[in-house]
């Protein structure tokens, strides 16, 4: 049985955090030298993350599927496979590796493919986080059964992040969908701005991976400690 990714992101009061495990990125290169996925996952779980995203792309992010399998065995949170999924095979592969959810990137897929992959994932008891970066992509996704919509603040052409992307696209998403803001979220002030706009969850990777104290940073983002006390963790 899978763990429900969608249910983990529902909350009445505080935002839910999908904490991401990634060793490297195209824009930054190696982000974290002392990279132990299982250890990081355990810190995430103990520090209040609602779900964990694991980068499994090898070429750009130095990830691998075995990271996901190892993480799944070591925590009780739902696990998202973060990768460039362009083929049904990768969806079966994700399920067999232990994923509870997969990322579908609207920019890479046609409306028909998104719908087909949503249905396949559903048959395999997995949720999908369907990611958009523009109004055109969002309109395409809203013509499918996507239930969890991620707004990526990072422009994949320039790698720059801008939270305005979330603020612009959020009002176009109908009630009843779970909305996730991804990338470029660094402080509790950022989180509070997103909560005001009705964002259910955020996906945070680099901010946590670059932190000297992952647990403190996660607590700060969740508003569990006063961010003025955390200058040393920057």
State what each model feature region is.
Residues 16, 28-129, 135-140, 166-169:
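N-terminal active-site wall of soluble small-molecule enzyme domains
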Residues 93-113, 150-159, 199-218:
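Glycine-rich phosphate-binding active-site loops on the catalytic face of alpha/beta enzymes
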Residues 148-204:
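Catalytic-face loop-and-helix region of soluble metabolic enzyme cores
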Residues 86-97, 134-144, 181, 185-204:
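Catalytic cores of alpha/beta
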Residues 20-24, 57, 84, 107, ...:
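Active-site beta-loop-alpha junctions enriched in small/polar residues
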Residues 227-234:
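Short, low-complexity, charge-dense intrinsically disordered segments
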Residues 168-172, 195, 210-226:
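C-terminal helical cap(s) of enzyme catalytic domains, especially alpha/beta-barrels
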Residues 1-22, 26-27:
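N-terminal amphipathic alpha-helix/helix-capping segment at the start of soluble metabolic enzymes
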